Amino acid sequence: MPISATARPTIPPTVWATRGRYVGERAEETLRSSLSTLKDAGDIDDFLELPADDTKPDLVFESRTRVGDGVTVRARLSLAPATGKGRDWLLVAEAERPRDRSWPSPVTMFWPAEPDAGGSHDPASGLRPGEICPLPEDDKAVRRLLRDCARDPWYIHVVVHEAMTTDERGRVPLAHWLPLGLRDRVVEHRATPQQYRVTNWALRDVDVKVPRGGAAVLPGRPAPEGYEPDAFAVRAVFLDGTEPVDLVDAVSRYDALPRELPQEAAEALTALREDWHLLTLAEELERERALVAMYAEALDAMTKSRDLYREAAERAHEALEAYREAGTVTPSPL
């Protein structure tokens, strides 16, 4: 199949990319305090706030940690200026090897983990990942919300229909059963028994149908290659406090699909790779050696160019002398 010239790259297996919104006050102070606490506790190795840039309004923070058996993860978070809805942020992180879902989310390398910290909200819906989010009571609001969430390229949106009113056992969030690396990426929408029709009516444009008493993973936009609505619909989710194995599997399979790298994330990833400041001593030495090698190569090239130029000039001079000695008249340049 031919590849479109406009096709965007997919997210590399070593990379996380997400965005969020801070809805509280004093976002900068919260972020700085959280980073200091994380470093003091040994949860991150180090962090750095980059100097303000007059040409860019965002504040930029870098954080580095080790996960698993010592795999280094570098992360970059940019915090946008405040708006009436809060302060949006964009995070990209890259590990030394393909990411593992059992590793903590890079969001925890910056923001406090407390539910009331205000750091992690989905800008598209205003909802907080990792919690149960009931659908609005108003039908039009349901349609608007699900329409927007079905096209969200950043988060994984899951709609669960309650076959009957649940008790406390049924109010365990899906995130409770998910690997650490997915808990900050999944937004769980809950539809009441009476909202079965309006839920599916709202999703008809993306060809998704939530089974009665079941669940569905929404496609996002663009839908990842390999996504088929039926393959990511779960026929029955028992909200009785037991692990929803089939739904966890559907979310994990969706997360494994190759997804397009959003333009904003691509730019942030380039900055992470090419303009990283939070270096270890070994990394600083390596960078200095690379700079010395680069300068040496440039000097060598200049020297060779100079020598070639001098050699060519000498040959031209010799040829001119030979013409003169042979009595050849040199043509006028005019």
Give the role of each language-model region.
Residues M1-R190:
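N-terminal, leucine/charged-rich tether regions that mediate assembly and partner docking
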Residues E264-L308, A312, A316-A319, A326:
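Heptad-repeat coiled-coil/leucine-zipper oligomerization helices
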Residues V329, P333-L334:
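Extended, charge-rich intrinsically disordered regulatory tails
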Residues D116-E286:
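Acidic, Ser/Thr/Pro-rich intrinsically disordered low-complexity regions
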Residues L31, F61, V73-L77, W89-A93, ...:
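Long, contiguous hydrophobic alpha-helical segments, chiefly transmembrane helices and signal peptides
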